């Protein structure tokens, strides 16, 4: 393609998988397109569930034209982005999809709206940002429900720190450590009694559980609050929130000691780049890169994903595959680096 028009025309041939395509050129054009062969389903179709395909009642009504796909071409707000989040409604409806939560998208918009004179250095800081505004909202929604009469003075101090937390998951953050341990037990105490241990662990590997943490933290009434295993007691949200907080603290005390000042994020959030040969213990230190303590967390711009587990060891399993900043005013000023840097060259000073 020689220009944005030719580039856009070529995208309509992408049917699957669905991709977010970002565009920029030296003429100053910017664009984002959601590319896939989308279709319209009957209003009665519950697309999140398995449907009866035998009677034809849930067949797609039509395939959409590519022009109906979500997109933004040279928008008036002067930037485009994607964090695999749910796009705004198109033609009065939202398109269903397997989206990630809005955490990263909200932070991207906040940062981009706050600065007009972006340069390479500012962008380098942005792409390693580890703050989640959504986690701040979740933390405040949960902390206000905790019955402090049942906590020690030290526990109350921790609760106060969480209620004032700015959502930054830096290496020395105690709040990030407590928050994620609390969320694990919050999910466990809410869903495991109905799902069972095996299905609950599968549930923790889905995008769906990421998208419901914030709504459940805000939701007052739910059938999920009651523990199905306690027939004589009907638990409410406050019971689940308090018991989860207490269990999180007990878990951290057992793992990291009684002093909460030592519960820093670098103790529980690590990254190791594995090599096939490094799976053998005796070769691990020679072939693997790491493990290292690493800042960032799930669903922030510096997206270091880990699956919640009972042992609380938040081992990063995925993250940015590359970091790249292209300066169209000076292409030679662009930078790019892989996650493992120069580690494949043992003689490199880097």
Feature-to-residue mapping (PLM):
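C-terminal/peripheral segments of proteins
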Residues: 1-151, 157-160, 164-350
């Amino acid at each position: 393609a020689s220009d944005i028009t030719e580039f856009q025309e070529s995208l309509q041939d992408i049917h699957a998988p669905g991709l977010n395509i970002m565009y920029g050129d030296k003429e100053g054009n910017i664009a984002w397109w959601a590319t896939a062969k989308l279709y319209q389903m009957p209003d009665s179709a519950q697309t999140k569930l398995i449907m009866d395909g035998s009677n034809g009642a849930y067949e797609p009504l039509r395939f959409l034209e590519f022009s109906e796909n979500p997109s933004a071409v040279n928008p008036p707000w002067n930037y485009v982005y994607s964090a695999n989040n749910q796009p705004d409604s198109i033609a009065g409806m939202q398109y269903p999809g397997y989206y990630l939560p809005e955490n990263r998208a909200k932070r991207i918009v906040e940062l981009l709206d706050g600065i007009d004179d972006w340069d390479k250095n500012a962008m380098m800081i942005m792409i390693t940002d580890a703050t989640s505004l959504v986690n701040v909202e979740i933390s405040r929604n949960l902390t206000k429900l905790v019955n402090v009469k049942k906590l020690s003075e030290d526990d109350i101090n921790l609760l106060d720190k969480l209620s004032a937390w700015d959502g930054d998951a830096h290496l020395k953050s105690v709040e990030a450590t407590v928050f994620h341990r609390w969320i694990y037990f919050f999910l466990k105490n809410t869903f495991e009694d109905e799902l069972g241990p095996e299905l609950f662990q599968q549930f923790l590997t889905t995008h769906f559980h990421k998208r419901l943490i914030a709504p459940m933290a805000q939701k007052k009434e739910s059938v999920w609050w009651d523990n199905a295993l306690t027939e004589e007691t009907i638990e409410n949200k406050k019971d689940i929130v308090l018991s989860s907080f207490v269990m999180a603290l007990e878990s951290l005390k057992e793992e990291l000691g009684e002093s909460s000042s030592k519960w820093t994020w670098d103790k529980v959030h690590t990254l190791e780049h594995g090599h096939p040969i490094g799976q053998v213990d005796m070769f691990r230190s020679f072939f693997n890169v790491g493990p290292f303590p690493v800042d960032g967390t799930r669903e922030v711009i510096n997206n270091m994903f880990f699956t919640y587990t009972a042992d609380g060891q938040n081992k990063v399993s995925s993250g940015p595959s590359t970091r790249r900043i292209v300066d169209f005013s000076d292409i030679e000023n662009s930078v790019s680096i892989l996650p493992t840097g120069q580690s494949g060259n043992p003689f490199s000073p880097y």
